[in-house]
Design a protein with these regions (language model features):
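Active-site/ligand-binding neighborhood in enzyme catalytic cores
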Residues: 1-63, 69
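Mid-domain catalytic core of redox enzymes
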Residues: 56-169, 175-184, 188, 196-201
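Phosphate-binding glycine-rich loops and adjacent basic patches that engage nucleotide phosphates
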Residues: 1-12, 148-162, 219
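Soluble or luminal CAZymes and related metallo-dependent hydrolases
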Residues: 37, 189-190
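Short glycine/proline-enriched coil/turn segments at helix->beta-strand junctions
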Residues: 49-52, 76, 205-206
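Flavin (FAD/FMN) cofactor-binding core of flavoprotein oxidoreductases
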Residues: 176-178, 191-219
Length: 219
């Protein structure tokens, strides 16, 4: 990291910022996402494939090779036939599906460690955050033993995420640090814990105008 910082420090300023944007053009950013969120991608895939070909709420028990094809066994007892199978599931779920025909690979996949995590998104008026927000967020060193791992200034990374007079902040909880918070606290308690930490770091003058918790258990 120190070497990277030294390289950036010694680099000419022009190469850091690049050419200035043309009049009427937004400044260049290294952060990109869909304006309507990540669901834009699966929705586009569904539109392309045809929603009549998509099975929602169907759990797969196992997949097995059958010559040049594959059999997909659902927990409902139904069996589907496919030319190809792509597993986009967590390693522990994929291991259960393939253990019938490749026990060695299933064992290796089962050994991959997973942890639960959550994000807590909160919105404030700009004047209700005391500390000037520079950059796009911060990472909390594990040695500080705080209940959040990091925070992203979502509305600064992506200006369209909040009105000009507001801030949208997202905190990360769990993973390999204080994972129990994701399991043990309800949404209200988890949000309160995050706000306590953010108040210490950023200085909050009021309660958030909006909050939302998302959890990923073992994923």
């Amino acid at each position: 990291i120190l070497g990277m910082l030294a390289a950036v420090k010694n680099r000419p300023a022009a190469t850091l910022s690049g050419p200035p944007p043309k009049p009427g053009q937004p400044a260049m950013t290294y952060f990109m996402s869909f304006k309507r969120g990540m669901e834009t991608l699966p929705q586009a895939c569904a539109d392309y494939i045809g929603k009549e070909s998509i099975r929602l709420g169907a759990s797969v028990r196992a997949v097995e090779p059958r010559g040049k094809e594959w059999s997909v066994f659902l927990t409902s007892g139904e069996e589907l036939t496919a030319d190809h199978v792509i597993l986009g599931t967590a390693a522990y779920d994929s291991a259960n599906m393939i253990k019938g025909f490749n026990a060695n690979l299933a064992t290796q996949m089962s050994a991959i460690q997973w942890s639960s995590s959550a994000t807590v998104t909160v919105a404030f008026k700009r004047e209700d955050v005391k500390v000037p927000l520079r950059g796009f967020g911060f990472i909390v060193p594990k040695v500080e033993n705080r209940r959040i791992n990091a925070s992203t200034y979502s509305s600064i990374k992506w200006s369209y995420r909040a009105p000009d007079d507001s801030l949208l902040l997202r905190a990360f909880v769990g993973g390999g640090h204080h994972e129990e918070l994701v399991h043990d606290l309800d949404d209200a308690a988890l949000t309160a814990a995050v706000l306590e930490e953010m108040d210490t770091i950023l200085g909050l003058k009021s309660a958030p105008a909006f909050s939302k918790v998302y959890r990923w258990f073992k994923g």
